[in-house]
Swiss-Prot record:
It catalyses: L-seryl-[protein] + ATP = O-phospho-L-seryl-[protein] + ADP + H(+); L-threonyl-[protein] + ATP = O-phospho-L-threonyl-[protein] + ADP + H(+); L-tyrosyl-[protein] + ATP = O-phospho-L-tyrosyl-[protein] + ADP + H(+). This is Dual specificity protein kinase CLK3. Residues 1-138 are annotated as: Disordered. Residues 156-472 form the Protein kinase domain. Leucettine L41 inhibits its kinase activity and affects the regulation of alternative splicing mediated by phosphorylation of SR proteins. InterPro entries: CLK_kinases (IPR051175), Kinase-like_dom_sf (IPR011009), Prot_kinase_dom (IPR000719), Protein_kinase_ATP_BS (IPR017441), Ser/Thr_kinase_AS (IPR008271). The keyword Transmembrane does not apply. Autophosphorylates on all three types of residues.
Length: 490
């Protein structure tokens, strides 16, 4: 009789007492999502044909949203971005982060290890030994080979695949220790750098859980973790699609303003909690913001003469804490995914919590219009776009930066007659000109975004202040309340 395979773990990894210091590369762009997927990496922008420059901005955004020249070799890939399975995400993450790292001598062969089959109950032990007769197996890249019907830890039964990325894979499981509740299990590759990044993320998630016992602050909930034969595994609550994936599947039709308002309020609420606990996320983007439930209804838009998907419930969770940094920790020079990276990071002036506020401003614009505000992957062009949209960079920031190669006599060095110069000139305009309507609530949204997109981080609005902004006066009492969810403990 055929038996499904049950895996048991060796002794838990004793890293809980590990005092950690974050180590990241000097130049990192981790763009990577549980149901959580990653970004494509198209050819470098300089290699495009001249005909490409004539592609409309929104279409070019869809095709080249994710390119960048920065690399990150020592981060935890996006929780929301690499899993919950967007093909866009997986393609980009593979091209970005698959490097010459190998932890075994024979990198091109599968690796098998025998499992243990000990159990406290004798009958359970006999069943376990039969189901563990097959070896634990890794593929050539260190991914755990597992199938629907397999078990891990005599607890998690795999019932579906949610996605695979550079860091590993995510599978949907039934947690038999908790009444067959559904969870998303993130299984990290058996590779040292990813294992270490997962340990750092687990420590951050544990700190968040300690501070938010009732799960009122909308951060993704870790319910369990364990080391399975070198694979760090993290169990999370099962959530819906990430907000970028939903946007993409809706043909990049922007979210309605009431949806933008509710998601913005939740984002400010969640990130204020992190900031008050001396933690900066550093990698906020639509991929790392997940719907609790992404069920939708299809509506006909008479104005656009097309059908649109409208999510039924705009409750969200913030995910991917693999790069989150406490105030007392070392702050690397480069943080944040390119499109959401603030000027102080590009100019290497140092960063803190206002870094997240800038990212939220960029995210809100993307929700509102359906495309990124700063569609670029090069520092100089990025700064030029900022000036075209937001006005001149403050002189004191120019004087302080070490990146003087971008400036001459206090101004950006830029050729407006080049193909890149023409592109920026044609497609970047003052922020308010992107408003779809002149009604009060649209004006209020753009006022909030402009305050979040202040060049000087010292002048940028704080999230405590943002929550009091008039834009949020239109929220319903239900939207202002945050219902606690079940918070399972280890």
């Amino acid at each position: 009789m055929h038996h499904c395979k049950r895996y048991r773990s060796p002794e838990p990894d004793p890293y809980l007492s590990y005092r950690w210091k974050r180590r990241r590369s000097y130049s990192r762009e981790h763009e990577g999502r549980l149901r959580y997927p990653s970004r494509r990496e198209p050819p470098p922008r300089r290699s495009r044909s001249r005909s490409h420059d004539r592609i409309p901005y929104q279409r070019r955004y869809r095709e080249h949203r994710d390119s960048d020249t920065y690399r990150c070799e020592e981060r935890s890939p996006s929780f929301g971005e690499d899993c919950y399975g967007s093909s866009r995400s997986r393609h980009r993450r593979r091209s970005r982060e698959r490097g010459p790292y190998r932890t075994r001598k024979h990198a091109h062969h599968c690796h098998k290890r025998r499992t243990r089959s000990c159990s406290s109950a004798s009958s359970r032990s006999q069943q376990s030994s039969k189901r563990s007769s097959r070896s634990v197996e890794d593929d050539k890249e260190g991914h755990l080979v597992c199938r629907i019907g397999d078990w891990l830890q005599e607890r998690y039964e795999i019932v579906g695949n949610l996605g695979e990325g550079t860091f590993g894979k995510v599978v949907e499981c039934l947690d038999h220790a908790r009444g067959k509740s559904q969870v998303a299990l993130k299984i990290i590759r058996n590779v040292g750098k990813y294992r270490e990044a997962a340990r750092l993320e687990i420590n951050v998630l544990k700190k968040i859980k300690e501070k938010d016992k009732e799960n009122k602050f909308l951060c993704v909930l870790m319910s369990d973790w364990f080391n399975f034969h070198g694979h760090m595994c993290i169990a999370f609550e099962l959530l819906g699609k990430n907000t970028f994936e939903f946007l993409k599947e809706n043909n990049f039709q922007p979210y309605p303003l009431p949806h933008v308002r509710h998601m913005a309020y939740q984002l400010c609420h969640a990130l204020r909690f992190l900031h008050e606990n001396q933690l900066t996320h550093t990698d906020l983007k639509p991929e790392n913001i997940l719907f609790v439930n992404s069920e939708f209804e299809t509506l006909y838009n008479e104005h656009k003469s097309c059908e649109e998907k409208s999510v039924k419930n705009t409750s969200i969770r913030v995910a991917d804490f693999g790069s989150a940094t406490f105030d007392h920790e070392h702050h690397t020079t480069i943080v944040a995914t390119r499109h959401y990276r603030p000027p102080e990071v590009i100019l290497e002036l140092g960063w803190a919590q206002p870094c997240d506020v800038w990212s939220i401003g960029c995210i809100l614009f993307e929700y509102y219009r359906g495309f990124t505000l700063f569609q670029t992957h090069e520092n100089r062009e990025h700064l030029v776009m900022m000036e075209k949209i937001l006005g001149p960079i403050p002189s004191h920031m120019i004087h302080r930066t070490r990146k003087q190669k971008y400036f001459y006599k206090g101004g950006l060095v830029w050729d407006e007659n080049s193909s890149d110069g023409r592109y920026v000139k044609e497609n970047c305009k003052p922020l308010k000109s992107y408003m779809l309507q002149d009604s009060l609530e649209h004006v209020q949204l753009f006022d909030l975004m402009r305050r979040m997109l202040e060049f000087d981080p010292a002048q940028r609005i704080t999230l405590a202040e943002a929550l009091l902004h008039p834009f949020f006066a239109g929220l319903t009492p239900e939207e202002r309340s945050f219902h606690s969810s079940r918070n399972p403990s280890r």
